[in-house]
Amino acid sequence: MILQNKTFDLNPNDIAGLELVCQTLRNRILEVVSANGGHLSSSLGAVELIVGMHALFDCQKNPFIFDTSHQAYAHKLLTGRFESFSTLRQFQGLSGFTKPSESAYDYFIAGHSSTSVSIGVGVAKAFRLKQTLGMPIALLGDGSISAGIFYEALNELGDRKYPMIMILNDNEMSISTPIGALSKALSQLMKGPFYQSFRSKVKKILSTLPESVNYLASRFEESFKLITPGVFFEELGINYIGPINGHDLGTIIETLKLAKELKEPVLIHAQTLKGKGYKIAEGRYEKWHGVGPFDLDTGLSKKSKSATLSPTEAYSNTLLELAKKDEKIVGVTAAMPSGTGLDKLIDAYPLRFFDVAIAEQHALTSSSAMAKEGFKPFVSIYSTFLQRAYDSIVHDACISSLPIKLAIDRAGIVGEDGETHQGLLDVSYLRSIPNMVIFAPRDNETLKNAVYFANEHDSSPCAFRYPRGSFALKEGVFEPSGFVLGRSELLKKEGEILLIGYGNGVGRAHLVQLALKEKNIECALLDLRFLKPLDHNLSAIIAPYQKLYVFSDNYKLGGVASAILEFLSEQNILKPVKSFEITDEFIMHGNTALVEKSLGLDTESLTDAILKDLGQER
């Protein structure tokens, strides 16, 4: 039954049978994620909710919309992908997120947070116009309710009364910040005269009871607080049901039946346990959110820790070192304190470093205001999430030339998370903005120098980028040097052709340089360093070389080679330039080395391409 491509085979009246299905799903998730890595604890925690959804609804008539969709593994297993699930996050295998091109049962692409309700509103509007039966059903995590788009969608949904079911999966992972902030806003309701008077009267009554039952006084206030979120949603015109036990299938089924009958917008508040069913992961929220391969029995990682610091660690260590000396340094991250390395700074200086939750636009705008007040804000953010704050960069930082510092992590190809998470766009869109300074380090040592430069640069916004995992260039190959605004660095002068690397592209170019040397072809190597402004001496630097080859981890359109070609055109210089950047397509998931090879960006393919361009055979 469960292995078939039919969701209606799940009998909502057979709770015991559904519980067995849940156990089967959990076992399969654990088996595959322990081997491949992936988003474990959120997927384990959402199993009963997803089984309940499939038991009651046909997801092709009632589109299931998974917010972020990293918790949708059970959905994949229930929709014909039980066996192929072994290829999860592997090159040319199943995506770790919902993906319509993978399955007709995946309604919408997902990967970024907080979009599900907005998508659902669009579906509901379309269904109303087409007079289509059915309603969208969105499963969203607690972290997603901190983003503005969630409230924008609720605003219209409550006003228009479109039929829609929202299931808020409250696993107390991301909810600590957003619900904490929401609770503060909602606490005004609890400070009102009704609540205060009612509480006072009940406490007075309870105080007359024997001490053995006086514990009810404290339980009363806790229970009354549960009403508050409901009041908030009801005031917006959204029916609220909950909180319910998100692991009790009987309760889930009955609640979904009720929500289905209402034919109005409904939010079901379900409380779940992240990592449910795997004792080692239960309650250890952040550690088991996203994992690499691990031993099922011990929970220990199968990968040994690298002796070399990751770029993220090199960045955060350097920023911490500077923050100890400079009280003007502050920092912001948008719900990624651990991923960006800002967690250690938040722990050390909680009044100066902030996790603002999933609110990238707010992160950039508030940082711009801090810069105006004389502080030095470092915004630590993944490349893929920075694009969510583009207007804030333009409107709030760059127009006024406020010196925020964008530390762009996960730049380039990121591997198993795929097209929704690749860090390939930042170069193209940032270089189009006036007043923005853009530069990139080539290794951990120059990354430290990049942080130093950003800290001292006070005349405009600046941005520097670095990759996930490690740089392509090994430590110590070239002596590190400090950054000087608009200056490149010629690492090797000899040769008839010039390899130009930007950021992590320097390491890629260096590997090609070594491969070509084995073919008796000497190549010069330039670390471009600054993309904006370009080195004003670039025309003199490139003059001795017959051809230029450009290496960088970003899209070719509007990328590094484009900037160089624009410069050459303005200088009336004719020089052959070939770009080894990313072509105009969304890049799929998989092991980074395999993905790069498929794109012709591995050392062997790049070497062959240059040999061919030079008219030589390998």
UniProtKB/Swiss-Prot annotation:
InterPro entries: Dxylulose-5-P_synthase (IPR005477), THDP-binding (IPR029061), Transketo_C/PFOR_II (IPR009014), Transketolase-like_Pyr-bd (IPR005475), Transketolase_BS (IPR020826), Transketolase_C (IPR033248), Transketolase_CS (IPR049557). Its cofactor is Mg(2+); thiamine diphosphate. Pathway: Metabolic intermediate biosynthesis; 1-deoxy-D-xylulose 5-phosphate biosynthesis; 1-deoxy-D-xylulose 5-phosphate from D-glyceraldehyde 3-phosphate and pyruvate: step 1/1. Thiamine diphosphate binds at H70, G111, H112, S113, G143, S144, N171, Y278, E360. It catalyses: D-glyceraldehyde 3-phosphate + pyruvate + H(+) = 1-deoxy-D-xylulose 5-phosphate + CO2. GO terms for cellular component: cytosol. Mg(2+) binds at D142, N171. Pfam families: DXP_synthase_N, Transket_pyr, Transketolase_C. PROSITE patterns: TRANSKETOLASE_1 (PS00801), TRANSKETOLASE_2 (PS00802). It comes from the Bacteria. The keyword Metal-binding applies. Binds 1 Mg(2+) ion per subunit. Binds 1 thiamine pyrophosphate per subunit. Homodimer. PANTHER family: 1-D-DEOXYXYLULOSE 5-PHOSPHATE SYNTHASE-RELATED, 1-DEOXY-D-XYLULOSE-5-PHOSPHATE SYNTHASE, CHLOROPLASTIC. Catalyzes the acyloin condensation reaction between C atoms 2 and 3 of pyruvate and glyceraldehyde 3-phosphate to yield 1-deoxy-D-xylulose-5-phosphate (DXP). Belongs to the transketolase family. DXPS subfamily. This is 1-deoxy-D-xylulose-5-phosphate synthase. It comes from Helicobacter pylori (strain J99 / ATCC 700824).
